From Swiss-Prot:
Residues 1-107 form the Thioredoxin domain. The keyword Disulfide bond applies. Signal peptide: none annotated. This is Thioredoxin-like protein YdfQ. Transmembrane segments: none annotated. It holds the Pfam family Thioredoxin. Keywords: Disulfide bond, Redox-active center. InterPro entries: Thioredoxin-like_sf, Thioredoxin_domain. Disulfide bonds join 32-35. It comes from the Bacteria. It comes from Bacillus subtilis (strain 168).
Length: 112
């Protein structure tokens, strides 16, 4: 399963995004049952993409994340490429569609 880095402040989030060409940010809350169901599936999908780094944010611990990333519900899945948000999914995630989008983007940017 994909390794995941816990991010506990806006500074650590910004640094994570800057440090990796492909940064995937997963935002959740402990009491969110959908979040608990989505995370294992997400980690399995991301296993196919070795250069995508996964970071996790607990929105209860980093309240500023809502304003910084316009988060109105959880879970939120954000893909950043070279520091720019490229993909966003929220609440109910269609994993087949997400996987296809990731494959297209990954091939395009890995071919550079």
């Amino acid at each position: 399963m994909k390794e995941m880095t816990g991010l506990h402040s806006l500074v650590s989030i910004e640094n994570f995004i800057k440090q990796h060409k492909f940064s995937f940010i997963y935002i959740s809350r402990p009491g969110c049952t959908v979040c608990h169901a989505v995370l294992p599936q997400l980690r399995i999908v991301l296993d196919q993409f070795p250069n995508i780094k996964l970071g996790h944010i607990n929105a209860d611990d980093v309240a500023e994340v809502a304003g910084r990333f316009s988060v109105f519900t959880v879970p939120v899945l954000l893909l950043f490429i070279d520091g720019t948000e490229f993909l966003r999914e929220a609440r109910f995630v269609h994993f087949e569609q997400l996987e296809q989008k990731l494959k297209r983007v990954y091939r395009l940017y890995e071919g550079e």
